[in-house]
Swiss-Prot record:
Record organism: Acidovorax sp. (strain JS42)
Family: Belongs to the universal ribosomal protein uS3 family.
NCBIfam families: rpsC_bact (TIGR01009)
Gene: rpsC
Lineage: Bacteria, Pseudomonadati, Pseudomonadota, Betaproteobacteria, Burkholderiales
Keywords: Ribonucleoprotein, Ribosomal protein, RNA-binding, rRNA-binding
Pfam families: KH_2, Ribosomal_S3_C
Protein known as: Small ribosomal subunit protein uS3
Length: 288
C-alpha cells in the first residue's frame, strides 16, 4: 500500500529550496536547528492572525535575517512600525545575534497551501460544515489559477464517534513528477470533539530549477508507425502492402489457385504432365 511522501522534502534541491539557509559545523548544527524551531513556534503563536504562510531564516556572518511571508503584512508591521520593532528585539534576545526582519506579501493567498489549510481549520473551529469549507477553498483556488488541488481532512468530522478521513480533488495533482511545483501545507483544528487535521496539496504548474520558472511545454510527436527491419528468413519487413487492400506478392509462398496445400509455383511441371497424360492413366491414378 503506497504512502504519501512529503512533497517539499521530496523536491528539495530539484524544484524547492530549504526554509533554513545557513551552514554550521557539526558541533553547532543541532543547537542552531533547535533555535530555528523555537523561533518558528514563537512567530506562529505571535502572528496567529497575520496569515503567515512560511518563514525563511538565514544566518550570514554572525547575524540573522528572517523573512516572513504573510498575506496581511499590515498586521505584522503594526501602527507606525511599532510591532515589527518589538519583534526584532524579542528575536535578537532569543537568538543572541542582531536580527533583520523582512516582510514579504503573499499576492494570492487563495492558492497558498498553508493559508488554505489555516482558513479551513478556522472555519471548522467555528462549526462550519467541513465539506462546504473544503469545496469553497477548492473553487477559489481553481478560479485564481491553480492547475489542481487536493484537500484531505481527518478526525471526528461533524462530531461522529468514529474518526474517518475524507478528501476531495479537482484538476491534476502529479505527486510523482519532480518538476511539478506542488505546494503542501498542513493545519490542525482544535474542536470540542477533538483535533481535526487538514492537509492541502496545490499544483501550480511545472518549474525549471529553483527559480520557479514555468517549464516550456514540449509538443508530443505524433505516433508514427516505423517500417520494420529485414526479417531473418529473408522476407521483407515492411507490411505496407500486406493489408486488406494490398496484393500478396506472387512467388513461391503464394496460395495456389485450386486450394491445394502445395505452393502455386511448385507444381507447375506436374500439372503439365497431367494434361499430357492419357485419360486412362489419370483414372488409374485416382483409383490408387
Amino acid at each position: 500500500m503506497g504512502q504519501k511522501i512529503h512533497p517539499t522534502g521530496f523536491r528539495l534541491s530539484v524544484s524547492r529550496n530549504w526554509a533554513s539557509r545557513w551552514y554550521a559545523s557539526n558541533r553547532d548544527f543541532a543547537g542552531m536547528l533547535a533555535e530555528d524551531i523555537k523561533v518558528r513556534e514563537y512567530l506562529k503563536a505571535k502572528l496567529k492572525n497575520a496569515a503567515v504562510s512560511r518563514i525563511l531564516i538565514e544566518r550570514p556572518a554572525k547575524n540573522a535575517r528572517i523573512t516572513i511571508f504573510s498575506a496581511r503584512p499590515g498586521v505584522v508591521i503594526g501602527k507606525k512600525g511599532e510591532d515589527i520593532e518589538n519583534l526584532k528585539k524579542e528575536l535578537a534576545t532569543r537568538l543572541g545575534v542582531p536580527v533583520a526582519v523582512n516582510i514579504e506579501e503573499v499576492r494570492k493567498p487563495e492558492i497558498d497551501a498553508k493559508l488554505i489549510a489555516d482558513s479551513i481549520t478556522q472555519q471548522l473551529e467555528k462549526r462550519i460544515m467541513f465539506r462546504r469549507a473544503m469545496k469553497r477553498a477548492m473553487q477559489n483556488a481553481m478560479r485564481l489559477g491553480a492547475q489542481g488541488i487536493k484537500i484531505m481532512s481527518s478526525g471526528r468530522l461533524n462530531g461522529i464517534e468514529i474518526a474517518r478521513t475524507e478528501w476531495y480533488r479537482e484538476g491534476r495533482v502529479p505527486l510523482h513528477t519532480l518538476r511539478a511545483d506542488i505546494d503542501y501545507g498542513t493545519s490542525e483544528a482544535k474542536t470540542t470533539y477533538g483535533v481535526i487535521g487538514v492537509k492541502v496539496w496545490v499544483y501550480k504548474g511545472d518549474t525549471l530549477g529553483r527559480n520557479d520558472l514555468p517549464a516550456a511545454e514540449t509538443p508530443r510527436p505524433e505516433e508514427e508507425r516505423r517500417p520494420r527491419g529485414p526479417r531473418r528468413d529473408g522476407r521483407p519487413g515492411d507490411r505496407a502492402g500486406a493489408g486488406r487492400g494490398g496484393r500478396r506478392p506472387m512467388g513461391t509462398n503464394a496460395a495456389p489457385a485450386d486450394g491445394s496445400d502445395k505452393p502455386a509455383g511448385a507444381g507447375g511441371d506436374s500439372v503439365k504432365r497431367v494434361k499430357s497424360a492419357p485419360a486412362a492413366a489419370a483414372a488409374d491414378g485416382k483409383g490408387e
